[in-house]
Amino acid sequence: MRNGYTPSKNKPEYWEGGKIPWFRMEDIRQNGRILSDSIQHITMDGVKNGNLFKANSFILATTATIGEHALVIADSLANQQFTNLSVRKSLKDRIIIKFLFHYMFIIDDWCKNNVNISGFASVDMNKFKKLEIPIPPIEEQNRIVAILDRFESLTTSLQHGLPAEIAARRQQYEYYRDKLLDFKRKTA
C-alpha cells in the first residue's frame, strides 16, 4: 500500500515529454475503471526514488471522492487522492486480479463508512490496514468473475446489453401475449 503524489508542477522536466501514466479522478470518469493510460503523463525524473506503482494494481480514492477505484494495468503513478494497492508476491498465485477488481466495490462501500473527519474527510487508514479480504479457491474466483463480468457487460455495453435487454423483453412480451390471448374454446 502506497500513497500517490503530484510531482512539482514548477519543474517542467517532471512533465514535458512524459510517458509514464499519472492518474487522477478525471481518468476514471473519462476512461472507466480499467485503465492502461492516463490523460496526463510524467517523466521518470518526477518519480520519487524511481518507484512506480506496478501494473495490475489498484488505485483507491482515500480522500475527497472516497471509494472510487480502478484497476491499473500499466506501471504508473497517481495523485495524492489515491492509495495504491497491490497483491503481495506470496499471494499472486492464489488471487485472480479480476476477482479483486469486483471485490473492490465492497471495499469502496467499506471506505465510505469508515471515514475520519479532521479538517478534510479521509479513510481511517488504521482500520483499513486491518481489513481482511476473503480469498476463495481459484475455481470459485473464476466462477464469480465469469458471472459478474457477464452482468457488467449487460449493464454497461450498449452493443451487448441493449440487444440482450430487448431480446428479454421480446420474450417476455411473447409469453404474456400467448397467455393473455390463449382463449380455450368452450364446448357446450
What does each of the following model-derived ranges do?
Residues 1-188:
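Charged, alpha-helix-forming regions
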